[in-house]
Amino acid sequence: MENRSALYLPMTCKSALHAVSGIFPFKKDLNVYRGCENGCKYCFAVYSHKYMKPEEKQDRLSNGYYDHIYVKTNVAERLDKELSRPGFKREAVNIGGVCDSYQSAEAEYELMPDILRVMIKHKMPILICTKSDLILRDFDLIDELSKCAFVNIASTITITDESLREKIEPGAVSAKRRFSMLEKFKKTDASIGVHTMPVLPLLTDNQENMEAIFSGTRAVGADYIILQTLHLRGQTRQIYFDFIKNEFPALYEKMRYLYRAGHLDKEYKKRFYSMAEPLLDKYELSTDYMRPVRDAFGNDRETKQTVLFDFG
């Protein structure tokens, strides 16, 4: 089935939850879809489609990640079975680690309401980050879950200029709509956050954009904001450089230079954070991503305060 330029491919999954490691407030990840229609040019997750059927791949670099969307039609059923196992450890689940759970396909397949009902049944703590306000459709379910378990609702907001956002995140909604969505969830018992990640060198790292994001974050009463500069690895690196060359050719050579060592130039990164830190103070914003988790679970978890939350 086609939606815009995307092909939807229903499938059944053998498991719903997958273990993750690292400095995160969750130990398990759940992806309702494989692939993402948001089409973000900086997406780190395009690699994940290389494991899908090769005859259904299109683009050489993205492997069809943006336009071949696998729909896990039985995911809620599998999730319920996994959470019902004796001795299952009740730890926070991140919903949508390598896709947006509320991308356009969700408007048609409506898998998330059943996922949320399963989470309510088992009183499971969850985290959701989305670039869509379709999540408001499920407001009542999320509100109910937030009253019996830890819930964190976040949105990636890194571009406030709409003309630029439409080029870089063509399938997402505007920053204004994302802020509005977060403000509505502030009425629940969920914690809310803004993920300004990635910050794009030469495009979104200017003071005007940062001020707009930070002031918006303050206005909606977000519990935290986290920043991370752009990492370019694997297929993402070539996809992003090709995008810059086509859309912003005047920036191409400088962008290549900034990533000449395989990562963002350290001095450039230092200058950015030197600009951003005073603005965080100005708007009295917390960058402690883990604080809501500590508040919910106590200090016996492996949590620590982060400074600007850049993974380096």
Q: Where are each of the predicted segments found?
A:
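Generic structural signal for hydrophobic
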Residues: 119, 182-185, 217
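Auxiliary Fe-S-binding modules of radical SAM enzymes
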Residues: 1-12, 18-19, 207-312
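Active-site glycine- and acidic-residue-rich loops that bind
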Residues: 133-136, 200-211
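Conserved strand-turn element in the central/C-terminal portion of the radical SAM core barrel
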Residues: 160-162, 169-171, 184-206, 230-232
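Surface-exposed amphipathic alpha-helices with a cationic face
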Residues: 143-146, 182-187, 277, 281
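Conserved Radical SAM active-site core
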Residues: 1-154, 158-166, 175-180
